[in-house]
């Protein structure tokens, strides 16, 4: 059976006989597939297999064999991102976030659309690292792992102090905060909520034009969420054959 779907290549790994194995993020979720002669210069869709490339893929499915990429029509090579180290680093941060949170073959059309929009807009931003941190917040929201209430997750006490404590997406009062919690000022927490609750993408682009020093805390918050989860994308290859 053949399917055609849009997708962004997240990783590209060489295999035997000039084959390559790619991880593609699509509306159908994370997919792994191999491309015969994908590493060869003679492959007419070779560029569509490069990481951070958006393409329309034709894929052959023959379980239990691994999917095979039959064709790839390059839609956007994201050349600007690949020619700038700060942009490449920020895009890489988003890619790693997807690889560490998304299960293979779990449909995620909304998250895919969000990720593609972030990739398309990140070259426009003055502070790409902050912009990619916004994506991490949106991803936490997508996973249902970000408490946006105004009270402590444990005791339900209203949070009225000047400092807000967060860990793994949960909120804590000063009494229940521990050494690993990440502290946010009221202003920083307000910015966090504005990012999460933004309904239009242009709002995020405009916000990313300001030198707001909160990306390190957002990244730490996301890392605290990962500390309690496994890495889904590493659990897939067992039992798969290329041919």
From Swiss-Prot:
Disulfide bonds: none annotated. InterPro entries: ARFGAP/RecO, NA-bd_OB-fold, RecO, RecO_C. The keyword DNA repair applies. GO terms for biological process: DNA recombination; double-strand break repair. Keywords: DNA damage, DNA recombination, DNA repair. GO terms for cellular component: bacterial nucleoid. Signal peptide: none annotated. Coiled coil: none annotated. HAMAP family: RecO (MF_00201). NCBIfam families: reco. Belongs to the RecO family. Involved in DNA repair and RecF pathway recombination. This is DNA repair protein RecO. The lineage of its organism: Bacteria, Pseudomonadati, Chlamydiota, Chlamydiia, Chlamydiales.
